[in-house]
Design a protein with these regions (language model features):
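Glycine-rich ThDP/TPP pyrophosphate-binding loop and its adjacent helix/strand module
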Residues: 199-208, 215, 220, 224-282
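A short, small-residue-rich loop immediately preceding and capping a beta-strand
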Residues: 114, 122, 130-167, 255-268, ...
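Active-site-proximal loop->helix
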Residues: 139, 147-205, 294-306, 414-421
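Claisen-condensing/thiolase-fold acyl-transfer catalytic domains that form or cleave C-C bonds
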Residues: 263, 267, 361-422
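Alpha-helix C-terminal capping segments
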Residues: 81, 125-135, 149-161, 183, ...
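Active-site/ligand-binding loops adjacent to catalytic centers
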Residues: 202-228, 232, 281, 286-377, ...
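Positively charged, low-complexity intrinsically disordered leader regions
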Residues: 3-26, 32-135
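Buried hydrophobic positions in well-ordered alpha/beta secondary-structure cores of metabolic enzymes
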Residues: 27, 71, 107, 119, ...
Length: 433
């Protein structure tokens, strides 16, 4: 695989319509005060992606700063445990080796990027855009903290002032990332409104942007919000799918049968899906947060319990009551704990091109444990949803099937949450026989 062919985005392949819609979803639902800044951003982005110097700098930084391309790793032990139907019992001495004729599982290792997650791909691209547009100050929201860390990292590199908004509940469960942001020079502002999670952080970041539009750039972290954000984020994240497609052809000799990724706003998923959208035989499966159960306020599975609505600038699938009030959400994973999904995901689902499932908190913890004890990899709790779903899926697949999973981030940030979950993950499997 030639690195020069995979690091830089291929812009302009799947643009929304002139109003920013993917089918019935997307658009721009913003107050009058944001119309001019959004138009400035749109013009700035379309100009930047045609600028060879901008593209070359992004390409160079993705390779030599972020560490792209990230590896594609075959998880043989995980595949064997999934075949045996033992996700909840993973970790017994000696591991489980897969049958060579059985299902093969490959992990796209976004956890190995600089900062430890896929978020840096988008943060770096948008930070370069902010500098190109003459903005000296960047504001961002964060849930799991990885986007905040990535934004603070990019701003430190490019000499930009950085302010990150984060719900106080997320600050509690992602305390390590709060410290990392401070160390990188960012100001972290706790948001104590509403559910004190990602939705509320986005509200505050957008208020800041409205009040400081002249010198401030809003660096949105997922494939949602008003146009052009869903397009920009997908294009900056499309490097994942483009690399993964070339790597799986090289290692396995053919395309995968399934591509699986967790879905909060949906940036890591849309990034890897983008490399396979034209390959109709490849199933694309997004995994949402099933939380405690599918009931109002107990989960964040928009396609399981949501309906079409508008939230924070975009029309998409939203968790809301009959009156259109946004429902509270819950997930053990801060990065999936959000009431809406990116509009392109909603459109692709309507087209029948993508499928969506959900995994509970308990199942995600089992996925976390399985990957740690079978492969020696600590996944983010977000990614653990995709791992857990894959292990449930393996026994249903034909021998020789290939599953590609996007391992969107590493789990260092989630250790305290895992500790707080009690003995489910930390106890020795032998003690529970």
């Amino acid at each position: 695989m030639k690195e020069a062919e995979t690091a830089r985005p291929v812009f302009g392949r799947r643009d929304p319509d002139a109003r920013g819609y993917f089918g019935a979803y997307g658009g721009r639902f913003v107050p009058e005060t944001l119309v001019a800044p959004i138009e400035e951003l749109t013009a700035g982005y379309y100009a930047a992606r045609k600028d060879e110097a901008f593209c070359e700098e992004l390409d160079r930084l993705l390779k030599h700063y972020v560490g792209r391309p990230t590896p594609l790793y075959e998880a043989r032990n995980l595949a064997g445990a999934g075949k045996a139907g033992r996700a909840g019992e993973a970790g017994r001495v000696g591991g489980v080796r897969s049958d060579p004729a059985g299902v093969r599982v490959f992990l796209k290792r976004e956890d190995l990027t600089h900062t430890g997650a896929h978020k840096i791909n988008n943060a770096l691209g948008q930070a370069l855009l902010a500098r190109r547009m003459g903005k000296r100050r960047v504001v961002a929201e964060t849930g799991a903290g990885q986007h905040g860390v990535a934004t603070a990292t990019a701003c430190a590199l490019l000499g930009l002032e950085c302010r990150v908004y984060m719900g106080t509940e997320d600050m509690r469960r992602q305390a390590l990332n709060v410290v990392r942001m401070h160390l990188l020079g960012a100001t972290v502002h706790g948001v104590d409104a509403g559910s004190r999670t990602l939705k509320d952080a986005i509200n505050e970041a957008m208020r800041d942007w409205v009040a400081n539009v002249t010198d401030t750039y809003y660096l949105l972290g997922s494939a949602l919000g008003p146009h052009p954000y869903p397009l920009m984020v997908r294009e900056f994240q499309s490097v994942i799918g483009r690399e993964a497609r070339a790597q799986i052809l090289e290692q396995a000799g053919r395309l995968p049968d399934l591509v699986v990724a967790c879905v909060g706003g949906g940036s890591n998923a849309i990034g890897i899906f983008d490399g396979f959208l034209d390959d109709k035989a490849v199933r694309l499966i997004g995994v949402e947060a099933g939380g405690e159960k599918i009931a109002p306020g107990r989960h964040a599975a928009r396609f399981a319990g949501g309906s079409t609505g508008v939230l924070q600038g975009t029309r998409t699938f939203v968790l809301q009551d009959e009156a259109g009030n946004i429902e509270l959400t819950h997930s053990i994973s801060a990065g999936l704990d959000y009431a809406a999904v990116g509009p392109e995901h909603a459109w692709l689902r309507d087209l029948g091109r993508t499928e969506y499932a959900h995994i509970s908190d308990a199942e995600a913890l089992d996925g976390f444990k399985a990957l740690a004890r079978l492969e020696g990899i600590l996944p983010a709790l977000e990614s653990s949803h995709a791992i857990a779903y894959t292990m449930q899926l393996i026994p249903t697949l034909k021998p020789g099937s290939i599953v590609l999973v996007n391992l969107s981030g590493r789990g260092d940030k989630d250790v305290q949450t895992v500790i707080d979950s009690g003995g489910r993950v930390l106890s020795d499997p032998a003690d529970r026989r």
